[in-house]
């Protein structure tokens, strides 16, 4: 579906802001690969670009790949921006540059939807999802593209049905430069974890696209150059279990038709381990990774954060069950909880050893607006606004002790030998049970060339020039002896980033939360 403009032509520059370097964007991996420069295409901005009227010209710039230029701004009638809290500084900077050309700037996305007061300099704020606010913004720009005298806020009251969503405008993006693709099947999550802003922003009743839409989008992504993997960005892939069961057979057939070109990944709650019928279909659809918000192995803490659904199955048992279907578990972990003790760090390290999960996003607790956690801490007077701190939460343990615990866990969890040992375990117990499709599409000349470039870069940058070459060669030789080059490449692309980033974090050179941004980083010159 597209909006209408009454035949008026406009030129819209869509700019996606650069990410602050973080654990989850894998910047340290890009030099190992062929022409990769960014993590994944921004769904929201590309959907908006596709929704704009046919009469409008649209240009898309992802500043993780290249910066918007003076020529881009000179071409445009208006600028659209979208992003998350951690991109706040960069969003404000784009606004300032656009205003240098006297262009009106509209901001949408999750950050402004949660905190419109963060963005006083933007001309238009789009609060909420695609819907009537989008149509109002389009109508306003159809009528007039001069900057308004004061900020105008459009708030979505009537969301567009997801079955009417257009295919994201992948053709505008340099898809081959992304580490992986992204796709959205549903929006919303039925659970109310205390720290999570998803239910407040997108609702508790998951809204859905049709399986046919998803298949069409996957076909378009391949046409536009997405390769390797596609990540379902749904807040919870099994938020509607019936819908997941409806979609999965379509994905299985699509994979067979297209030669299993893409591995799939998603986010889901741990109770997926109780649904073997879903896990078996996911295996057949070539799902290879699930991000599970385990948060903590402490049952008392899980109950306190209203994450009781993580206790429907013993955590270690759930992880092993998921892995038995060939699916690697990636885990979210939070430190700084009210239930933490001085021994929590050691408890976490024991859990990592027992679970053998290689990749864990270990964050300090951060209170996000529009969450029950924010409301509770505000009542308790425990929200802290201090740009010298790693979190806006007044922990019950001393702040410096919690930060030191986080640094220690990062350093130990991603020590090269320990990390690669966990990957050895995954290869033997999870990767061994997944599908191993052999198709002409996977063995294409382009894929073989890409693999050879990656192998060359990995051997040169890690095996010869790197400072953990002994651990690397112990791991690599085991893979090479078995002819297992694919897993060698897949593991080292991820592991290298984790090792380098963890070193930066343990030295205090990285934020202790992927969801925070310090005030000094968010500051921009006043206009």
From Swiss-Prot:
Its cofactor is [4Fe-4S] cluster. Keywords: Iron, Iron-sulfur, Metal-binding, Methyltransferase, S-adenosyl-L-methionine, Transferase. Gene3D superfamilies: tm_1862 like domain (3.80.30.20). Pfam families: B12-binding (PF02310), DUF4070 (PF13282), Radical_SAM (PF04055). Its EC number is 2.1.1.-. [4Fe-4S] cluster binds at residues 189, 193, 196. GO terms for biological process: methylation. GO terms for molecular function: cobalamin binding; iron-sulfur cluster binding; metal ion binding; methyltransferase activity. It comes from the Bacteria. Residues 36-148 form the B12-binding domain. The keyword tRNA processing does not apply. Residues 173-408 form the Radical SAM core domain. Induction: Up-regulated in an EcfG-dependent manner under a variety of stresses, including high-temperature, acidic, alkaline and hyperosmotic conditions. SUPFAM superfamilies: Radical SAM enzymes. Binds 1 [4Fe-4S] cluster. The cluster is coordinated with 3 cysteines and an exchangeable S-adenosyl-L-methionine. Belongs to the radical SAM superfamily. This is Hopanoid C-2 methylase. It comes from Rhodopseudomonas palustris (strain TIE-1).
């Amino acid at each position: 579906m597209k909006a209408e403009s009454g035949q008026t032509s406009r030129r819209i520059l869509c700019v996606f802001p650069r990410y602050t370097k973080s654990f989850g964007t894998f910047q340290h991996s890009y030099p190992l690969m062929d022409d990769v420069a960014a993590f994944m295409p921004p769904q929201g901005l590309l959907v908006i670009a596709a929704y704009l009227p046919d009469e409008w010209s649209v240009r898309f710039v992802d500043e993780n790949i290249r910066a918007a230029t003076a020529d881009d701004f000179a071409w445009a009638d208006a600028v659209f921006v979208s992003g998350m809290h951690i991109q706040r500084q960069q969003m404000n900077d784009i606004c300032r540059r656009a205003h240098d050309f006297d262009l009106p700037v509209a901001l949408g996305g999750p950050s402004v939807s949660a905190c419109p007061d963060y963005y006083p300099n933007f001309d238009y704020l789009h609060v909420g999802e695609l819907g009537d606010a989008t149509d109002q913004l389009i109508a306003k720009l159809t009528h007039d593209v001069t900057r308004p005298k004061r900020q105008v806020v459009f708030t979505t009251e009537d969301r567009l049905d997801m079955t009417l969503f257009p295919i994201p405008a992948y053709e505008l993006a340099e898809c081959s430069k992304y580490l992986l693709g992204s796709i959205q099947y549903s929006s919303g999550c039925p659970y109310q974890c205390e720290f999570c802003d998803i239910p407040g922003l997108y609702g508790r009743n998951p809204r859905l696209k049709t399986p046919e839409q998803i298949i069409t989008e996957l076909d378009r992504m391949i046409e536009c150059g997405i390769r390797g993997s596609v990540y379902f960005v749904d807040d919870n892939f099994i938020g509607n279990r019936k819908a997941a069961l409806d979609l999965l057979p379509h994905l299985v057939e699509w994979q067979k038709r297209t030669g299993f070109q893409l591995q799939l990944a998603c986010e889901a709650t741990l109770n997926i381990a109780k649904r073997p019928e879903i896990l078996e279909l996911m295996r057949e659809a070539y799902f290879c990774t699930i991000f599970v918000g385990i948060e903590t192995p402490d049952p008392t803490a899980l109950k306190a954060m209203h994450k009781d659904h993580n206790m429907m199955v013993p955590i270690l048992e759930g992880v092993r069950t998921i892995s038995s279907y060939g699916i690697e578990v990636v885990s979210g972990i939070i430190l700084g909880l009210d239930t933490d003790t001085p021994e929590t760090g050691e408890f976490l390290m024991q859990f990592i050893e027992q679970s053998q999960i290689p990749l864990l996003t270990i964050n300090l607790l951060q209170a996000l607006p529009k969450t029950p956690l924010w409301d509770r801490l505000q009542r308790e007077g425990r929200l802290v606004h201090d740009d010298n701190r790693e979190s806006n939460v007044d922990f019950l343990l001393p702040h410096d002790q919690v930060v030191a615990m986080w640094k220690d866990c990062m350093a130990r969890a991603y020590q090269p030998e320990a990390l690669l040992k966990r990957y050895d375990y995954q290869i033997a117990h999870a990767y061994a049970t997944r599908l191993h499709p052999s198709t002409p599409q996977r063995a294409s000349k382009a894929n073989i060339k890409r693999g050879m470039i990656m192998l060359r870069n990995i051997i040169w940058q890690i095996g010869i020039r790197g400072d953990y070459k002994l651990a690397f060669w112990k791991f690599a030789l085991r893979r090479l002896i078995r002819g297992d080059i694919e897993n060698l490449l897949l593991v080292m692309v991820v592991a290298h980033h984790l090792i380098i980033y963890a070193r930066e974090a343990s030295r205090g050179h990285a934020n202790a939360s992927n969801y925070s941004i310090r005030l000094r980083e968010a500051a921009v010159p006043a206009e």
